[in-house]
């Protein structure tokens, strides 16, 4: 690193040595001291410039200690700054008020307000002061709360000066000395000399070089040229006279201006007249307030010299007048008087400011006039000898003119109103000349706010549209929402993004810029776009809610399906366990039919003692069920279903009868109803006699039960394959009964009934042969059945029922309801009711009729 101080001190010493030698100090000691001080200052400058602290703004060096916020000076807010400024102005105004009340005045009045109104004084105080000194506006008179015409002079003086009202017969206090007795005739207001306006020379008639030469403009007969008396204020001290006190200031103001400078631009010179507390030999307070007049607005009593409205000639004091002003700038909603058109055409979006109206007659352009009292006291301008106050000079010349009503009466009451541009009219806009600036500021502020709001609205509008586009169209299709109209190339297919009304489309084509809606003509388009945006947002929220609902429904459905799958798996597992426990006495369960028939139905008939009340179960017990059954999983519209079911029940009934009377009797209740539904033409006894063991078997089948080496106990049943539902139309599913033999056996049955022996109505033989009638055996009740060979199939032992043949329609009296049938016994005679056959119960129709058994 090296010695930084040494390296920093070298250039400083060299530079300052050269400068010191060039200057050439007077003494070596002085030179040494100066060089040392310069080196120290230079080293300090360079050290502060090259120090590491100077790179702290780059984040390289410097102290890492944070600044304490308490040590830093707190920044003053705008509101605090305004409040501090107003407080300072209030203090200054209070001091000026006290000074003005003590030293200044105009004709017995004051140049500052006296507290009738406590609100902010936002009028132009210099303008009001100038108008009051010029006697164009009434001064701020002291107001009285009460006034009586019977008050004496000393009572009026006491009340005006703020003292308590004395008694009428009280001795008045000592009056001040009358200075008018010591004045020369020229200063005596009761004399016949000219008035005080001739004491000063008007500024407008003098040039800058003529200010010191008064003899050029004043006549020798002027009172200023006459020798004053020794008691005259001018003779006593002319240099200190108030008439010459502001001469240097006036010359300075004239030197900075031009000769053609207007009177309003140039600050006029104020002159303070001698203080005279008397007017016409009486106190000035008594002279002013002896004919007091009440202000109709503030209800205070003032001297009769009040302002008069230009329109209706009503009195109004100056404190009330300065409070009346224009209303604040506002939109031109309720503005539009046909009689008073706006001075300049206003745009729709700009603010307007209406002139103040008269509080009495509501005439616009409120203004007042003022006629001063017939004397002068206090401050005056040195150019008041000229108009507009020249007309009032005759009223202040002498006592006779003061007492003469002919001079002052013509202007007291007017029959017509004065024009607003009259030179004697003072309007509210003159009192507040900044109304135009306030209006322009308000308009500028409104325009700035409108521009900011428009920019914010456009930014939000464009950002919202862009975000919507990115969320909906992920393929890069951008909607040109920042322009007024849609282009065909923007969408890729020449299709607008949405239907818009014609007015919006036309306005969009007319305003094809980045910031629509800046002008007032495009406000409606912005509102339409906002409504469209709100509608699109509502639609988007609705679609999102619908998608959420669908997603929730799908989730719930998946949960339900999962639960159902678990439940089915548990049921299958239980069924498999139950099958493995029971053993080899059962056929394998049909797992596909668990939902239709149930698992427990196969094991419901335990040990061959349970009554089978179901027509088609999935599994069966070979001990009490036939070797074959028809499953109910076939189509319900199969016309052969009920026939196959009934046939299986009949075969089961006959096969169970071969086992023994106990099994047959137990199985009869479940098959009796099916037998009755099939045919009432034959009895169960005849069916038992005609049945042969192993008569209906397919080729290649044996009567062994699955898993057993013994023949099936019910070997004479219909043996189908393990599928339980063989295809329709196969020989194994054809009808097992010859209904033609049923018709042919009607005649032998009638003969059998006559003989009283058992009848044999069915004989199953070859498939293509007609069923033979059984011989009548009235003596022998039984006939040995002929055993068919095992290789004869179902097609050889049955006859097929063709679809073209009429089928048998059986009227079921009980409907499809299955009820337990009474016990059936085989009888030998024909007197049993069960063996009887009614011919009328059998009918033949042309067509198929399906009667459901379920």
Curated annotation (Swiss-Prot):
Chief place of localization:
cytoplasm
Q: Name one GO cellular component term.
A: cytoplasm
Q: Which domain of life is it from?
A: Eukaryota
Query: Subcellular localization, per the record?
Result: Cytoplasm
Task: Report the InterPro entries cross-referenced here.
Answer: Sip5/DA2 (IPR039301)
Polar residues bias: start-end ranges = 44-57, 191-220, 228-242, 254-266, 624-634, 646-660, 777-815
What's the family?
Answer: Belongs to the SIP5 family.
Query: What is this protein's function per UniProt?
Result: May negatively regulate the SNF1 kinase.
**What is the protein's given name?**
Protein SIP5
Q: Which organism is it from?
A: Phaeosphaeria nodorum (strain SN15 / ATCC MYA-4574 / FGSC 10173) (Glume blotch fungus)
